[in-house]
Amino acid sequence: NQGLEGLQTKYGEHRVFDTGIREATIMGQAIGLSMRGLRPIAEIQYLDYLLYALQIMSDDLATVQWRTKGMQKAPVIIRTRGHRLEGVWHSGSPMGMIIHACRGINVCVPRNMTQAAGFYNLLLEADEPSLVIEPLNGYRLKENLPTNIGEYKIALGIPETLKEGSDVTLV
């Protein structure tokens, strides 16, 4: 995977490891690890496949803090990629359903990989579950990285203005 290249070598096979390709199981493992004090980043290969984990995300992950009156937390980060919209599989966009079904989970859709890094750096310190949907086209971009990429953070809920004008685009 382009985004995780070299992490297993750097951090070891006990911290960075493969699982079976069963989205519901990946989500269950991540919830269990997070409730034991770890900070898992669960990867679902493509946005389309997130649908197979949606019930667990909605019913179990998103509600842990609420159901336990704040006594337990599950700070899982779910990482996936999508939004190229080129075919039937691997490129769809079920965003409306995801946003409405996953109340209680931060949903981040970065426009490039630098912005994705800023979200990850922020979310790794958060106590809420989060979903980061990396843009497939982001893997093709050549970006100028900030010198502080390891500490660079993007706050949630603050819009980014790319160009001043009289129109607005809401996502």
Q: What is each of the regions a protein language model found here?
A:
Residues 159, 164-165:
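Glycine- and Gly-Pro-enriched alpha-helical subdomains that act as flexible
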Residues 1-139, 143, 149-151:
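Thiamine diphosphate
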Residues 168-171:
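Glycine-rich phosphate/diphosphate-binding loop of Rossmann-like nucleotide-binding domains
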Residues 148-159:
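Glycine-centered loop/turn motifs
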